[in-house]
Amino acid sequence: CLVGSEMCIRDRLYTDSVELIHYARNVIVKHVNIVQIMTYYSLGRWIVETQQMGQKRAKYGSKVIKILSEKLQEEFGKGFSEDTLKNARKFYLTYKERISETVFSLFAIEKSETVFSLFEKEPPFIVSWSHYLQLMRIENEDERSFYEIESAKSGWAVRTLQRQYNSSLYERLALSRDKNGVLRLAKEGNVIEKPEDIIKQPTVLEFLGMEEKAKYSETDLETALINKLQKFLLELGKGYLFEARQKRFTYDEENFYVDLVFYNRLLRCYVLIDLKVDKLTHQDIGQMQMYVNYYDRYEKLEDENPTIGILLCKEKNDALVEITLPQDANIYASEYKLYL
């Protein structure tokens, strides 16, 4: 073909792609996830470079993908549809800063297995291709980074990632943080170091399947949460261990009952949760303060941290909460929502 012609450029793209896919299939058994992702990254880069030919805007447009897809499917089957190649292109454009020229050359050009030792020391991609298909839909870079890190650290399945994104986990955590705290979310995920790190505004309980306008009691809500305990633990966040429901304690010959008692192994403290299906009152806050005081004085060990109290309520008045509680109180109020 005539060097520099459109046909020659497309043929080169196809030839390079075939060689790369054959290479990837040979090494994929050992390094299945990173090989798959790097293959799509490399295809995406070549597609962009072929379309643009060094220009800022694409010169040849979508027909490059259409022609390449047809040829690759003849060679390898249905795994390289137009949609797949479009996703590869989008993936490269989204994450192109992740891969250095040296690493790209070792993988896609030289096809050297020494590149995998670099990946083991510092993996450029930390979740599966299916996760990245979801992550690429997130426009905000900091938010996208947060969900990627949390997916890897918490072992989220793709379905869990979708649920956490749909419930606006990033925004709910960000609401209780300052600017530096929000930046840290994007770089490190949700690091649990202090009581404020476990609070979400609001707490989303859509998995209970309860109607928003239906009349229900605190016992109904509590029962629904226990029946869906695994999903409730996911919504609460990291480090939670369930201890008891309606935990009774006796003080001065009077019995009291805490709705839900958890232990957070990351914060090394008890977490008491009281459920309120109406607007939060100062009496509710005072009651939780008494529960927390009791646990701090009679239940927690010397080397454990102070007890945390969380009031899950239908509605709250932030000014009322602030004026009722002392500044150093380990008690938090969070509204719950029964729908996303």
Predicted region positions:
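Basic, low-complexity intrinsically disordered segments
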Residues: 5-6, 10-340
